[in-house]
Design a protein with these regions (language model features):
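An amphipathic alpha-helix signature
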Residues: 113, 167, 171-174, 191, ...
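DG-centered beta-turn motif at the end of beta-strands
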Residues: 140, 225-226
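Conserved phosphate/pyrophosphate-binding and hydrolysis machinery centered on Walker-type P-loop NTPases
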Residues: 6, 99-109, 132, 210-213, ...
Length: 270
């Protein structure tokens, strides 16, 4: 799932070793005293810690949903992300962890949820709608869990049939969530946002235009999704800079809401 990075001269403890198993990590890195490292602020360190904890929590919740069980701590995770990143009034140093095909769904979902919270705060979205957006951001890629590893391992080298297959499974993920949404006491607007995000590329179903506030929330999710795909570190694909990502998205006229891109800019780069 990734690595756990400790500061210089950290003593390795039994608890640290157990973290490898508990969090599904590849390993633990401890920097040597002479190892050059850029200064990390308290916020940077906190962000790294939160990413690891959040990833563990979203994996647990998505695994439960896949087994048709109610999520254990999803709403708690939403509240935590909202309390930390839905109120942030400055740029976040968005340090990315390396992703593989085995863990990208979890890491991508967490990054998109945080980005969505940052954008929503810039746009002064009400708290209730912000929570619905964060929930949708954590769940909209649920269908990727049905995609075989052999397809995910291709990265961007997908055939048209691969893309159609992935789209089919994203729609399957939505249809799996839909009948149990109220039972699981998840925000109803979240399901509408997920529907807009999932079915916008569907060849089988044309969805109706949503009400204005749902459309805006879906636009935020779609922009955050693309921005993270472009800037994330993947084993199969090198990332591009945040500035280059913004430039590429602005060039695709009509694909992304200009108001959303204007709100993304101050929280994504200086």
């Amino acid at each position: 799932m990734g690595v756990l990075l400790y500061e210089r001269d950290t003593n390795l403890t039994i608890q640290g070793i157990n973290s490898i198993e508990n969090f599904g990590l590849i390993g633990i890195f401890i920097l040597e005293p002479a190892e050059p490292v850029p200064p990390l602020s308290k916020e940077d360190l906190q962000f790294e810690q939160f990413q690891t904890i959040y990833m563990f929590k979203i994996k647990e919740n998505l695994d439960r949903l896949q087994a048709n069980q109610p999520p254990a701590s999803l709403l708690e995770l939403v509240k935590d992300i909202q309390s930390h990143y839905g109120v942030l009034d400055h740029k976040l140093n968005f340090a990315q962890n390396l992703r593989s095909s085995a863990d990208f769904v979890y890491k991508h979902s967490i990054s998109v949820a945080i980005l969505s919270a940052l954008i929503a705060n810039q746009m002064r979205i009400p708290d209730q709608e912000k929570a619905a957006l964060i929930t949708a951001s954590l769940l909209y890629d649920f269908g990727y869990l049905y995609v075989p590893q052999s397809v995910l391992d291709k990265g961007d080298d997908l055939t048209d049939s691969d893309r159609d297959f992935i789209q089919m499974n994203l729609e399957r993920g939505y249809e799996t969530l839909r009948p149990q949404y109220e039972t699981f006491q998840l925000p109803k607007p979240s399901l509408e946002i997920i529907q807009q995000a999932v079915f916008r590329n569907s060849k089988t179903l044309k969805i109706k235009e949503p009400v204005e506030n749902i459309k805006l929330l879906a636009d935020i999710l779609i922009a955050a999704d693309k921005f993270d795909h472009l800037t994330a570190m993947n084993i199969n694909k090198a990332p591009i800079s945040e500035v280059a990502a913004m430039a590429e998205m602005k060039k695709q006229r009509g694909a992304y809401n200009p108001l959303v891109l204007a709100a993304l800019a101050p929280v994504s780069y200086t």
